[in-house]
């Protein structure tokens, strides 16, 4: 299983850590405690809280749940129903990562260009270079690499590429699932067909495993409970 943090920036890792701490606390946490614990400056705290607020808004909308943050400047509290797993928030952080989105683009489209990716995500080439370097460092763990000539694509032998592909599913549970319709099994089948046609070296057993992983993910997101 791959370590989630390999695809994240330092700021994204800090956001994950803050979410975990607030979930575990289950009560108001004084701002001074947060600053001491994470050695955050006033600017860092405010920046992270702004990110957390946007993230919560996105999760509430996409997952049809109700999570809220109570911030009175002196303390902060994260309030969520008991049946809302922390994984919902953590997966949202990972899915919002540019490195993760670039990996998905390359897997589902096979090719992408720096120009197209920058325009789609409103970033400049300097940011794209940081993102592609981070992904390349992660790919090296699987003996794969990015081919950066004209159009970006992932290169590597079949066995290593399959290992990398599987790793994306286990970064944060079944993290590809939210990209599909949560109520449409036909959408799930279409995704499996894309993989089957695009990557012929994926075996029948591979495809069955992927379908099982994603079916469990669909069930989990529909019910709002974590399936382990």
Predicted features, each with a name:
Residues 2-228:
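A cross-family "folded-core" feature that marks the main globular domain of proteins
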């Amino acid at each position: 299983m791959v370590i989630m943090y390999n695809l994240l920036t330092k700021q994204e890792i800090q956001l994950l850590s803050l979410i975990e701490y607030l979930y575990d606390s289950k009560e108001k946490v004084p701002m001074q405690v947060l600053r001491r614990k994470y050695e955050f400056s006033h600017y860092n705290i405010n920046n992270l809280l702004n990110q957390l607020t946007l993230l919560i808004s996105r999760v509430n909308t996409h997952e049809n749940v109700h999570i809220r943050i109570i911030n009175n400047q002196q303390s902060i509290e994260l309030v969520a129903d008991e049946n809302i797993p922390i994984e919902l928030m953590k997966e949202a952080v990972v899915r919002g990562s540019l490195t993760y989105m670039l990996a998905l683009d390359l897997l589902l489209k096979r090719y992408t260009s720096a120009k197209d990716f920058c325009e789609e995500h409103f970033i400049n080439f300097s940011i794209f270079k940081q993102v592609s370097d981070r992904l390349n460092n992660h790919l090296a763990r699987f003996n794969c690499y990015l081919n950066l000539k004209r159009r970006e694509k992932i290169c590597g032998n079949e066995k290593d590429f399959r290992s990398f592909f599987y790793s994306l599913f286990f970064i944060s549970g079944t993290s590809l699932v939210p990209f599909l319709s949560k109520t449409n099994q036909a959408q799930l089948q279409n995704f499996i067909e894309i993989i089957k046609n695009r990557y012929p070296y994926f075996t029948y057993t591979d495809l069955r495993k992927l379908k099982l992983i994603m079916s469990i993910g669909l069930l989990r997101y529909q019910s709002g409970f974590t399936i382990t």
